[in-house]
Amino acid sequence: MTQSRSTPTKPATPETPNIPSADKWQASLFEAMAVLRNQTSPRFDVLLKRGTMSVEVYAPQKQDHQTPHRQDELYIIQSGAGIFSRDGQRSPCRAGDVLLVPAGMDHRFEDFTDDFVTWVIFWGPDGGEAA
């Protein structure tokens, strides 16, 4: 049996990203980037979702206007480089880096390159998991 790699339930718009079906188990960065090319800010796409977990791709342009999220999250930098600001601390980041942000913490990417793309993984309950 062949599993569809990308079968969103509805077309993505800047206000409403793709929401994948619950049985989707594989995603493609190339397919996500094709969706993002047609979006303006914010540029992100939900690739996989199961329970509280979601896998997304995020490619900000010029500025990152994020606000704190209700869930814990991981960023896995796919391409590019920049500065990651997290709870008042700033650190360089680049392709291959993994960054952890607890739920509710102020964070954003700054001074990033034009080719900056990151995977985003959200999981856990509202308010995050216990430390």
For each feature predicted by the language model, list its residue ranges.
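Short strand-coil-strand connectors
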Residues: 49-51, 85-89, 112
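Short acidic-glycine-tyrosine-enriched beta hairpin
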Residues: 88-103
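Ligand-binding loop in jelly-roll beta-barrel domains
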Residues: 103-129
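A short, N-terminal "cap"/entry segment at the start of jelly-roll beta-barrel domains
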Residues: 1-57, 62-66
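Short, conserved beta-strand element in jelly-roll/cupin
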Residues: 69-84
